[in-house]
């Protein structure tokens, strides 16, 4: 091979001299303005090298792509890079500019957009990274994602997106937030929706105007150049992820998703440790856990694939302290010491904290394992000492036989019931911090499935315990499950009603139909049953119409309903009759609203469907408000208030007047069919008995 005026002309040519038998033509120099031409008759097996430099420049080349044997990634490189072919079967090739999205394979044969250059093109050329002869031709960077400075990000926006200097300066805080909270990392991915949700929360907290999702994607790519996207997840649940970026360890955003199942899978697939530790390891638990990963439940899918659900629950909730057990003058059971009482307090507190931890991570499937581990501890050792957890010598394990004795002990039963009320109320406030806030349907369904499984899980875990203990524990869990079902239903109604309240034409039709209702007739019929003040009823009617006419939002309606409850129950504050007055108000509210709906039905009102939906929502939300007012007045949790009515025999005297108790007792005296049955069944028996008498 000869070098003809090497490097002396901008339009340098490369001459090839082959053997005599080949008689291959020689490429002649061409002017700089002439188009790129390809040598047609080159025989690779007979190309010979002539002494001289083995690297030739082919003019001004904008960008070259190099092959990195270690990273297996193609990367853009500034300047001109030249490669020496290895072996006699390859051709001398100059690789020129190309888009950055080069597939990660070793075959590249492209030549384009080069002015003033004559090249030899081949579709099977290899690029050898080790062929560089001069260090100043090394690639400037690899294709790994790397963060830009704030100035570089603004420059990229102005250059690539055409954003003016004024607009780009307004985005300084947005770009700086990305630099402060995120960093590049290999083998890590973040859901695109999660990152955008973090950004929206940042804008809300700092009173900034957020950009839309598409523009936000441009902001990210201006800061983290080379960022790629991947679609990850199971079929039907896949989401777009940014690949090569993660939260910084010191970012405050970590508290929103600390140790979630997603982070365990994507960022720490091997070394991540479960946050909860059962009191003991059960035989086969590890195998069951491994097998369950192959058959993902809906709850696992929500926790793994929808990390953004974390923003809809209260992960910063503070778990209240438990009260001390009030032993009074009751003697301790035989074989039980105060040390056992203290050990039970410590063990049950840690068990409840583990439950809180699992629910915060939306790992509902672990609740069953927690309960199995707690209620099926090891029996006492032969020497009578308590076993200790091998992983933590400070955490005792109550033997199962002693645990049964303690659960039969009346002061401990009351103490554990109070602790359960605190625990389950905290879980409700974590999962549904705001009953009116929009929640994804997948999260709502996961919560409802969780509530459906609770009673069965606890019953199976306590199958060896006496029925009295199981009944007491399941009663509180039932109240918790019922509360979750009610609140998720209320949330569903709120989202459906929100669309109605935002529709101007529907609101106008509702107002027109409501003005045709004969409220005087409604009041006349309801007064005998409810015995309400006429002035109060008229005021509520006028306020309702005014609020509807103003096309108030759902939040404004919620405030109006809250004011109604305050106004009605204010005369009973501090009185023992407060719970009864609250229940009576719910009955009267429901009766009046049903009378209005009946009138609308008889008049064939066009907005009947909208009124029916609104009525369902307002009845449920009124129940929610009254429930919390009664809990506040009695010093109990809402779970405790509702739990008292789940079992008639344990109904608190605080929530019922003596007249109510005596009336219910006298009605049921002497009827063997009714005694010992739940309230619902008693009502059915009494109804059937009355119909037979008729």
Curated annotation (Swiss-Prot):
UniProt subcellular location: Nucleus; Cytoplasm
A Pfam family reported for this protein in Swiss-Prot or TrEMBL: RFX_DNA_binding
PROSITE patterns: RFX_DBD
Regions recorded as binding DNA: 174-249
Cysteines paired by S-S bonds: none
Composition-biased stretches (Polar residues): 288-299
Gene Ontology cellular component list: cytoplasm; nucleus
Regions of compositional bias (Low complexity) in chain numbering: 300-309
GO molecular function, one term: RNA polymerase II cis-regulatory region sequence-specific DNA binding
InterPro entries on file: DNA-bd_RFX, RFX-like, RFX1_trans_act, WH-like_DNA-bd_sf, WH_DNA-bd_sf
Region (Disordered): 268-309, 659-694
GO terms under biological process: cilium assembly; neural tube closure; regulation of transcription by RNA polymerase II
Keywords: Cilium biogenesis/degradation, Cytoplasm, DNA-binding, Nucleus, Transcription, Transcription regulation
Function recorded in the entry: Transcription factor that acts as a key regulator of ciliogenesis. Specifically regulates expression of genes required for cilium assembly and function. Recognizes and binds the X-box, a regulatory motif with DNA sequence 5'-GTNRCC(0-3N)RGYAAC-3' present on promoters. Required for neural tube closure and neural ciliogenesis.
Protein family per UniProt: Belongs to the RFX family.
Subunit and partners: Homodimer. Heterodimer; heterodimerizes with other rfx proteins.
PANTHER family xref list: DNA-BINDING PROTEIN RFX2 (PTHR12619:SF17), RFX TRANSCRIPTION FACTOR FAMILY (PTHR12619)
UniProt-recorded name of the protein: DNA-binding protein RFX2
Species: Xenopus tropicalis
Phylogenetic lineage: Eukaryota, Metazoa, Chordata, Craniata, Vertebrata
